[in-house]
UniProtKB/Swiss-Prot annotation:
Highly expressed in the lung and to a much lesser extent in the kidney and heart. Dense localization in alveolar walls of the lung and in the intercalated cells of the collecting duct of the kidney. Residues 954-1006 are annotated as: GPS. This is Adhesion G protein-coupled receptor F5. Residues 268-366, 367-464, 469-559 form the Ig-like domain. Residues 163-271 form the SEA domain. It comes from Rattus norvegicus (Rat). It is found in: Cell membrane.
Length: 1349
């Protein structure tokens, strides 16, 4: 037994050996412990074969043998380690070779414990770490992964083992020998030989690495010979160990391989772990990057960006590197206050010998987004209000803080939930904390989010504290009488509010049209104004200022004393004749009002007399009898009126009653009710007092007109209004003055439809009742409120009654008395249609025998066209209306389109006073609830009831015609062919002509006519030729410019030609733009149309003025020969005249007329003619220039034909001058002819020939410019021939010119030229258009369309 003082040290060797012996027995221990007894290792398998024994013969086998050595002297350990390191492997023996030996486990006594450590690269198996006692205080392994120290040897083994995971080192090395193809064949002898020799050398060199397992050659590649191999080790090599191993490899390798030591190159796998904290980086965070590597090295670095810039310790960066237990390395980079500028690529490098390990990570910054309402308004009324701040970012917030800054200090209570990243700050401000009358004291509250890593994000909330408004209302008591006006002023000392409104004591809101609101810097004011008070205004009124949920209210009592309105006083007689000696009774009656008594006096001339009161049914009548006496003169006219005074001492007087006192000589007509009169006398009496039959106590309205014929009063006209309808008329007059008209209107419309149905018989016979209903509809349509479907149903029920065929006789009599009633009725219907609010409900189809209504609501993204059809079987009429999607797209969302059709209105509407042309179709009115972009194109189809005779016309109702009584107007509406059989139908559409003939013609041909089609074809074809020709002209001029501008005359001539072509080209393009704007596909954009009109005007004028410049320049060169102005002077004058004058004229025209919106036509983009004669700003300069050019041409031609001695310019100059005269002679007459034909088209009804000639000359003028202004120039011809190197043609041309035996192909005397001259009358052809349009729209027009025959 060993002594306790004996210090024993154990260590275990792993010996890997190879043997060629044949084994016929199981493996047994071949090395036993030197001190431990054999029975202590019973059952422990120390011999582990690497390969199974092959049956049948000797095979080289590899075995791993665990050898346990114990000794008492600790110093022996280092000696044995040194000895093992000095061995050169393989160690050859008799039949067995030792391939490698490694120390795995060392046990040393410490105190009373035996501590067993694993050598580097080895570890205790995991199960031993769990079941045995570990010595944690001495354990250098990373916690939680494995252990490398146990207390005592495990009794049943095993010893320390290589870890199951290992590190693969990929290495390349170069052999400085020639590469042979067999090295690519793994089965070749050369490949096997190289592989065996190299692996033996590699194994011998790398076995010294801790935890070495194996080495394998993987391939040979070219580049001399490059050897790729992998080394597997259990743990990372120590610094310098790879270099040392490489030296051993070269020492152990046969020198014939010529291995290059400097060619060792490591290719590591990713052995670096990279972590970023925090995972999501916010601006302001302190960010930590950590690289962890199992390779321990002192050579570590960090870099930034694509250029891999080195990072050093600074105020911004901090680098810290540590080695853990000598087996792993951790390097940390801390970036302080990370910003958007710091974002990018970051990487770490760990260099170990020939290996470089590292990784790269891109860092992005996430902005902190705080959600909060940036502005809040708080009323200091002690009600709590919450400010909310939330972060969109999911972050590890450490705290959320609230701060405030402002003139007043109002603190709140914070409530924070870090999990939801939200915080609430509750404020509760009372009146003592806010300055009185404060209308906007702002305090900035800031919520700040702070993350664990240092990032901060904040949001400012501007809170405006407003004190509760103190209202001051008109202090004086308000006491008025009916018919008088009053106003109530309500003042607030605070200017901040959300809403101001007035209501009655019953809570009924007053319509905003009755009050105004004004906001001041330190307060606000609202004034309720009633211009005509009624008894309904009697009561208490509340002025209410609302701010958020706080209400400030001021009240005022209003007393309205009853007093009849002047229009409510019924008088008898209105006018009468009486005998000078007889007494006469005057009567004034009003509706009885709950016993209200008035002081009533009658005023006769300058005297007043008290009246007697008598109640008759529902009327209170006041009478006075004028006693009979012989006046100072007879006959005599007397004016009498009654005067009502109420309890408030307010008064009203009636209209005057006229009494004519006569001596009685010629009196032939006498009646106790009507009175007396001489033959031919006409008087009016109220139906109420004319003996018209009525129920007792009822009040009827209207008047009866009588005429004395012979000895009898004959009733001329009767316009009486039945009592029920008269009552409704009086209610309608009161309703439009009522404070609650919105609330009363639906019930009133319902009562009106019921009463109209009951009074249908009276309406048929009484134009007065019919006129009263029209007046009622007119009054009610002015109420500013929305109309719903039920209200519209009641309105159409009323309309159905008054438009019945049986009422046509009443309509005829009514229109004889009041010709504007039909127009007034139609206007009322359109106002109701525009006020119809359909909302989300299904648009109703309202059907009656005499009126139908259909509608549609335009929703956002609406793609369906509006198309409605109306059929009236009883009237044998039908029609439909359509609006395309393009037009609907210009409407506001939720707009309502309403169409109302009437079969009988055609016979009722007033007819054209000149033509007396009736409408023989439906009348359809289409309205849109919101404003529309004009023109708004609409298509309609009507049934044609007059197939055999008459020409149909599409017309609309123009309210402004005939002194605003209205009439049919055909402006802007045309009959078109819709491609179907049109014998029984007429297709109408608003359209605008685009052919050139309309530029000056107010009486343009009808669309669809043969003339219109022909003019359009000529216009489009001509414009195409013109634009192409003008462009070609400019190209030709650019090509030959240097050749044809060698003298001043030619230079200036071509300057003029180029500018004429350029101006005409731009004018034609603008003309196309103008046509596109108004040609049926796009809404007329006013701004674009003004621009198009201006530029057409300007550039067409420029064409004329450049022609004038050309003429003046020719005149100057021929007449003032001795005077020679410089080229720059001529150019300055030319450009000033060519562009300056047109600019001045066109600018003045638009500046004077556009502010009054009379610059251009209503429905076309050209100068106005009807309103301002703006077209003269184009016509007058053009005519003057034509006359001047013609005069110059005559002078020039005369001068050329009869030259004088001494005046003859040089040969080249004369050639140029002759060309100029030729051009002027060709171009100017054509301009004159064009303008002459244009003037001819102005005359209404002008012959179609003028339209055709004008369009033809105007459209093709660009072609004429190219031919006669450019190509006829002999110098241009020569320059073009020379330009294209046509040597034969050019030489012949030159020769013939010099010898005079032939002429140029395009010269004036050539055969071709002569034919040209004969064709065009020896002149060129050039034309400039003078645009104008024909159609004019009427501003005050109806949406009602119909058909005239």
């Amino acid at each position: 037994m060993k002594s306790s003082r004996t210090v024993t040290l154990y260590f275990v060797l792993i010996v890997i050996c190879s043997s060629e012996a044949t084994w016929s027995r199981p493996a047994e221990p071949i090395v036993h412990p030197l001190i431990l007894q054999e029975h202590e290792l019973a059952g422990e398998e120390l011999l582990r074969p690497k390969r199974a024994v092959a049956v049948g013969g000797p095979v080289a086998e590899e075995y791993t043998v665990d050898v346990e050595i114990s000794f008492e002297n600790v110093s022996f350990l280092e000696s044995i380690r040194a000895h093992l390191n000095s061995l050169r492997f393989p160690v050859q023996g008799n039949g067995t070779d030792i391939l490698s030996m490694a120390m795995t486990t060392v046990c040393t006594p410490t105190g009373n414990d035996l501590l067993c450590f694993c050598e580097k690269g080895y570890q205790w198996p995991e199960e031993r770490c769990l079941s045995s006692l570990t010595c944690q205080e001495h354990d250098s392994a990373l916690p939680g992964r494995y252990c490398n120290c146990l207390k005592g040897l495990p009794p049943q083994g095993p010893f320390c083992q290589l870890p199951e995971t290992y590190i693969t080192l990929k290495i390349k090395v170069r052999l400085n020998i020639g590469f042979q193809e067999d090295l690519e064949n793994t089965s070749s002898a050369l490949y096997r030989s190289y592989k065996t020799d190299l692996e033996r050398a590699f194994r011998a060199g790398y076995r010294t690495l801790p935890g070495f397992r194996s080495v394998t050659v993987t391939q040979f590649t070219k580049g001399s010979v490059v050897v790729d191999y992998i080394v597997e080790v259990a743990s990372a090599p120590l610094p310098g160990s790879i270099h040392k191993a490489n030296e051993q490899v070269i020492q152990n390798l046969n020198q014939t391989y010529k291995m290059d030591y400097n060619s060792f190159q490591g290719t590591p796998s990713n052995e670096t772990k990279f972590t970023v904290t925090p995972e999501f980086i916010f601006e302001g965070d302190n960010v930590t990057l950590e690289c962890e590597s199992e390779f321990v090295s002192s050579n570590t670095s960090w870099f930034y960006g694509e250029k891999r810039s080195d990072i050093q310790n600074s105020d911004k960066f901090s680098i810290h590197t540590s080695i853990i237990n000598n087996i792993s390395l951790v390097t940390r980079l801390t970036i302080f206050n990370f910003t958007q500028h710091d974002a990018g690529l970051y990487g770490c490098n760990v260099t170990l010998d020939i290996f470089e390990y590292g990784t790269v990570r891109k860092l992005d910054v996430t902005p902190i987004r705080i959600l909060a309402k940036e502005e809040r308004k708080v009323v200091c009324d002690n009600n709590p209000i919450s400010l909310n701040c939330c972060s969109e970012n999911i972050a590890n917030w450490s705290r959320i803080e609230w701060k405030q800054e402002g003139k007043i200090n109002i603190e709140g209570t914070p409530e924070t939930d870090l999990e939801s990243s939200c915080s609430t700050y509750t404020l509760k401000a009372d009146g003592t904390q806010c300055p009185s009358g404060s209308s906007g004291t702002t305090v900035i509250y800031t919520c700040e989010f702070v993350s664990v890593y240092g990032a901060k994000g904040s949001k400012n909330i501007a809170v405006t504290f407003t004190s509760v408004a103190n209202l001051t209302i008109t202090p004086d008591p308000i006491s008025v009488s009916e018919g008088q006006s009053f106003s109530i002023t309500c003042l607030s000392d605070v200017s901040s509010f959300d809403e101001v409104y007035w209501n009655t004591s019953a809570g009924i809101k007053i319509h905003p049209r009755f009050y105004t609101m004004r906001r001041y810097r330190d307060g606000a004011e609202s004034v309720l104004t009633v211009k005509t008070s009624t008894r309904e205004w009697n009561g208490t009124y509340h002025c209410i200022f609302r701010y958020k949920n706080s209400y400030s209210i001021a009240t005022k009592d209003v007393t309205v004393h009853p007093l009849p309105l002047e229009s409510d006083i019924m008088m008898d007689p209105l006018e009468a004749s009486g005998l000078c000696t007889s007494s006469h009774q005057f009567k004034c009656c009003i509706e009885e009002n709950d016993g209200e008594e008035y002081i009533v006096t009658f005023h006769v001339d300058s005297s007043s007399f008290p009246a007697e009161r008598e109640v008759i049914g529902k009327q209170a009548c006041y009478t006075y009898s004028l006693p009979g006496k012989l006046p100072s003169r007879c006959p005599k006219d007397i004016d009498v009126f009654c005067h009502f005074t109420n309890a408030a001492n307010s008064s009203v007087r009636s209209p005057s009653m006229k009494l004519t006192l006569v001596p009685g000589k010629n009196i032939t007509c006498q009646d106790p009710i009507i009175g007396i009169g001489e033959p031919g006398k006409v008087i009016q009496k109220l139906c109420q007092f004319a003996g018209v039959s009525r129920s007792p106590g009822q009040t009827i309205g209207g008047t009866v007109t009588y005429k004395c014929v012979g000895s009898q009063w004959k009733e001329e006209t009767r316009a009486c209004i039945s009592a029920p309808i008269n009552g409704l008329l009086q209610l309608a007059k009161a309703l439009i003055k009522s404070p609650s008209q919105d609330q009363k209107l639906p019930k009133y419309l319902r009562d009106l439809s019921v009463s109209t149905g009951k009074e249908e018989q009276d309406i048929r016979s009484s134009p007065g009742s019919l006129g009263a209903i029209i007046s009622i509809l007119d009054l009610l349509s002015t109420v500013p409120t929305q109309v719903n479907s039920e209200m519209m149903r009641d309105i159409l029920a009323t309309i159905n009654v008054i438009l019945d065929k049986s009422t046509l006789n009443s309509w005829e009599k009514l229109l004889q008395q009041q010709s504007n009633q039909s127009s007034q009725f139609l206007q009322s219907v359109e106002r109701f249609s525009k006020a119809l609010e359909l909302g989300d409900s299904t648009p109703p189809f309202l059907f009656h025998p005499n009126v139908q209504m259909k509608s549609m609501v335009i929703k956002r993204g609406h793609a369906q066209m509006y198309q409605q059809k109306f059929v009236f079987t009883d009237s044998d009429l039908w029609g439909d209306v359509a609006i395309d999607e393009c037009q609907l797209g210009s409407l506001q969302p939720d707009s309502s389109i309403v169409t109302v059709a009437f079969p009988t209105l055609k016979a009722i509407l007033a007819q054209d006073g000149q033509r007396k042309t009736p409408s023989n179709s439906l009348v359809m009115t289409t309205t849109v609830s919101h404003n529309i972009v004009k023109p708004f194109r609409i298509s309609m189809t009507f049934k044609n009831n007059h197939r055999s005779g008459g020409k149909p016309q599409c017309v609309f109702w123009n309210f402004s015609l005939a002194n605003n009584t209205g009439g049919w107007d055909s402006s802007g509406c045309t009959v078109e062919d819709d491609g179907r059989d049109n014998r029984d139908r007429v297709f109408c559409k608003c359209n605008h002509l685009t052919s050139f003939s309309i530029l000056m013609s107010p009486d343009s041909p009808d669309p669809g006519s043969l003339l219109k089609i022909l003019l359009d074809i000529i216009s489009y074809i001509g414009l195409g030729f013109s634009i192409v020709s003008l462009a070609a002209c400019l190209v030709v001029e650019a090509m030959v410019w240097k050749s044809v501008t060698k003298n001043r005359t030619s230079y200036m001539r071509h300057i003029c030609i180029v500018n004429i072509a350029l101006c005409l080209l731009i004018a034609d393009i603008w003309f196309i733009v103008a046509g596109a704007i108004h040609d049926g596909h796009y809404p007329l954009n006013e701004t674009a149309c003004v621009a198009a009109t201006f530029f057409i005007h300007f550039f067409y004028l420029s064409v004329f003025f450049w022609m004038l410049t050309l003429g003046l320049m020719l005149f100057y060169r021929l007449i003032f020969i001795l005077h020679d102005a410089s080229k720059s002077t001529q150019k300055a004058i030319a450009f000033s005249l060519g562009y300056g004058c047109p600019l001045i004229i066109s600018s003045i025209t638009v500046g004077v007329t556009q502010p009054q919106e009379v610059y251009m036509r209503k429905n076309a983009c050209w100068l106005n003619w009807e309103d301002t004669r703006a077209l003269l700003a184009f016509a007058i300069p053009a005519l003057i220039i034509v006359v001047v050019n013609v005069s110059i041409t005559v002078v020039v031609i005369t001068k050329i034909l009869r030259p004088s001695v001494g005046d003859k310019p040089g040969k080249q100059e004369k050639s140029s001058l002759f060309q100029i005269s030729k051009s002027i002679g060709v171009l100017t007459p054509l301009l004159g002819l064009t303008w002459g034909f244009g003037l001819a088209t102005v005359i209404q009804g002008s012959n179609a020939v003028f339209h055709i000639i004008f369009t033809l000359l105007n459209a093709f003028q660009g072609l004429f410019i190219l031919l006669f202004g450019c190509l006829w120039d002999q110098k241009v011809q020569e320059a073009l021939l020379h330009k294209f190197s046509l040597s034969r043609w050019s030489s012949q041309h030159s020769k013939s010119t010099s010898l005079g035996s032939s002429t140029p192909v395009f010269s004036m005397s050539s055969p071709i030229s002569r034919r040209f001259n004969n064709l065009f009358g020896k002149t060129g052809t050039y034309n400039v258009s003078t645009p104008e349009t024909t159609s004019s729209s009427v501003e005050n027009s109806s949406s009602a369309y119909s058909l005239l025959n």
